[in-house]
């Protein structure tokens, strides 16, 4: 066998492995977003990816390995709004409104996944680990947005950042722009 042909076969094999790895990761992400991590079986992931279970295990020896790959891939493709952009806005009211608009837009785009993972985090260590960076992000965001020393103002800001707050407003037919105005007024009155 020529050196060139061997090099090509190795490259093709590496490409095939990477493609299979990605198919498995994306199948798991799809299931996590539709039924949730706790209700996603490895058999269902393998079936959705079009591979056998042993192939799945070769790529992801443990469920934790698969979960870590899913979280990493999902949040790389769906990054949270940029905190530095908020820091750069000098006017506190404008900063808060911009932050809410961006965060609520993020929630609109990612609600099924976030709801499923947050639900499952209550009883799954893997899901809890997956939401830890989101929780840290929200703590940092609140630190940027809380401008008053009043306890109620801080609580109002933290409440406004919660996915559950946005979900409640959306479920009541409140458009994002109106939700931003409403919640901004609530926080200002605290």
Please report, for each region that a protein language model flagged, where it lies by residue:
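Basic, helix-initiating cap at the start of DNA-binding domains
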Residues: 1-51, 58, 64-65
């Amino acid at each position: 066998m020529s050196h060139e042909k061997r090099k090509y076969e190795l490259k093709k094999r590496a490409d095939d492995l990477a493609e299979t790895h990605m198919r498995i990761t994306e199948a798991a992400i799809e299931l996590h977003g539709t039924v949730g991590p706790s209700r996603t079986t490895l058999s269902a992931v393998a079936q959705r990816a079009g591979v056998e279970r042993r192939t799945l295990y070769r790529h992801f020896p443990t469920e934790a390995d698969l979960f870590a790959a899913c979280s990493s891939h999902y949040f790389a493709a769906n990054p949270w709004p940029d905190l530095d952009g908020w820091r750069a806005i000098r006017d506190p009211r404008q900063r808060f409104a911009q932050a809410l608009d961006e965060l609520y837009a993020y929630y609109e785009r990612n609600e099924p996944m976030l709801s499923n993972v947050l639900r499952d985090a209550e009883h799954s260590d893997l899901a809890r680990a997956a939401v830890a960076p989101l929780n840290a992000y929200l703590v940092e965001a609140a630190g940027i947005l809380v401008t008053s020393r009043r306890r109620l103002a801080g609580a109002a800001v933290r409440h406004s950042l919660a996915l559950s707050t946005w979900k409640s407003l959306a479920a009541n037919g409140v458009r994002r722009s109106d939700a931003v105005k409403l919640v901004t007024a609530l926080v200002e009155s605290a």
